[in-house]
Amino acid sequence: MDRRHFLKRSVATAAGIATTGVVATDASAKTVKVKTRLEYGQTIKEPSRRIPVVDSADLIVVGGGPAGFAASVAAARQGLDVIMLERGYFLGGLFTGCDVTLLNNMYSPTHNGRVQAVFGICDELCNRLDSHKMMVWAGTPPNVDTEATKYFMEEMCVEAGVRILYGAHASEVSMSGDRIDAVFVETKSGRVAMKTNFVIDCSGDGDVLAWTGEDFIEYKNHISAMYR
């Protein structure tokens, strides 16, 4: 096979794989036959199975973004056994994952933006960042190092006794009457269930609320640099 035929065959094969994932070639390799695409609407029946209950907690917080972080730390400090489910592998969500370094709305726009308007757990986090020179007042509001923010968020959770589960994607809830009694979680080990008395939905999309069947209003943000 010369170079021209090799390249021709390689391109055709790659195109077929990208299209359907299934490729058949004849013996001469002059033609490539691609199987027809699957039609939309087809379904596959998933066999029923019993889901193992692997843990339980007073409170399960779904999502490890800024809201989930604050909710988990606050609840754990009040003595609750807290499990935080984070589908990624760091805390902070879009704040740290997308390098949103500005602490918007934490400081008042008056008096050169140096009048603090937000306190509490966020203030504690900022104090840790500032003490390690990971907060820069290059303008108003200040900028923070997002990698350091991930670290200190986790540190505060661990100190409070929050049990963080990374790579854990909440996918459904189990209801007992009008109350959630368990959360189904997709993990690297498969689907598992975790029992709980309370759930705080910090998914960013209101997923848990939707799964319960409660009424909600769907609001779609315009795609922009502000709403990612």
Walk through the language-model features, giving the residues of each:
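Core beta-strand elements of the Rossmann-like FAD/NAD(P) dinucleotide-binding domain
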Residues: 55-57, 190-198
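Conserved N-terminal/central alpha/beta ligand/cofactor-binding core
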Residues: 11, 74, 80-81, 86-179, ...
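Mobile, glycine-rich extracellular loop/lid and propeptide segments
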Residues: 66, 169, 196
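Glycine-rich loop(s) and the adjacent beta-strand/alpha-helix scaffold that form part
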Residues: 201-228
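Conserved beta-strand-loop-beta-strand element in the redox core of flavoprotein oxidoreductases
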Residues: 176-192
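Extreme N-terminal leader/targeting segments of oxidoreductases
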Residues: 2-58
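N-terminal Rossmann-like FAD-binding beta1-loop-alpha1 element of flavoenzymes
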Residues: 59-80
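Ligand-binding pocket scaffold of soluble enzyme catalytic domains
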Residues: 67, 96, 189-193
